[in-house]
Curated annotation (Swiss-Prot):
Source species: Arabidopsis thaliana (Mouse-ear cress)
Protein name as annotated: Sphingolipid delta(4)-desaturase DES1-like
Function, as annotated: Sphingolipid-delta-4-desaturase required for the biosynthesis of delta-4-unsaturated sphingolipids and derivatives. May be required for the biosynthesis of glucosylceramides.
Leader peptide range in chain numbering: none
CDD domains named in the record: Delta4-sphingolipid-FADS-like
UniProt KW keywords: Endoplasmic reticulum, Lipid metabolism, Membrane, Oxidoreductase, Sphingolipid metabolism, Transmembrane, Transmembrane helix
Organism phylogeny: Eukaryota, Viridiplantae, Streptophyta, Embryophyta, Tracheophyta
Motif Histidine box-1 location, chain numbering: 103-107
Short sequence motif Histidine box-3: positions: 271-275
Localization, UniProt: Endoplasmic reticulum membrane
Amino acid sequence: MGKGGREKISSNEEEREGVMATDFFWSYTDEPHASRRRQILSCYPQIRQLFGPDPWAFLKITLVVILQLSTAAILHNSGWLKILSIAYFFGSFLNHNLFLAIHELSHNLAFSTPVYNRCLGIFANLPIGVPMSVTFQKYHLEHHRFQGVDGIDMDVPTYTEAHLVTNIFAKTIWVFLQLFFYALRPIFIKPKPPGYWEFINFLIQIVLDVSVVLFFGWRSFAYLILSTFVGGGMHPMAGHFISEHYVFNPNQETYSYYGPLNLLTWSVGYHNEHHDFPRIPGNKLHLVKEIAGEYYEGLESYKSWSQVIYMYIMDTTVGPYSRMKRKLSKSD
């Protein structure tokens, strides 16, 4: 894994022999990002200057929210085929952009004051149609701190998913329904009681949803929901769900994407760089690779998220088990 160091990996032999594995890849070392972060900062301390909020985040989010809600209003009398087409080829990009804006805000990368980021996250959530921004932050920060840890990292598929999704047809359905699995996984595996801010998130979202239906009709609301659903399934933008941590190389558990869709996704494709430095906003992650390139050049990466989806579905050795897992270390 380049200068980040190699991991000790244990997995069944099936995947290496051309058959889908029957268990996860189990690692007996810590996740690679903390150690690589220390190494890079010792060599390039100037990277600390990249830490901090993106001053343009508020403006970018506001423009996308206004554009998407305006589009929903314009489509209030449109036919269903037109609504579905615009949702897939236009609205999906906007709502997925907002989902990844919420990801950015979960790291407090719009404002220095956390509560301002939380409020902006609730605002960014509006066109998505389903309240999720506050809950997402609670689980996502654990994904960083406990990457791959059994029972804590909710980004890793469940054993039920892995047992059921074992062929091309099942993987195709799984990709279509990715958002549902991401949403339901924490409820069954690691439920957390909702807090004050989640109720605020829920209340504001319901007010917006009801207002859209009352003022513009169900078709406008359906456009927003469809934009969320299709953008999180069989869609180029959704390729990052698979590309980030699904193991195509048993010696690497995080992968970056260096393609054009980074322009629309807050550079979430720079995923090794993001996990190494979660305090650096997306608009500066490319500078990490430019400054400390030798730490990333030896790592496998992607240039097409659509190709990643195709590889995941068609490769008979890859499935939900193709994830790195580890037990909780005593130091945690």
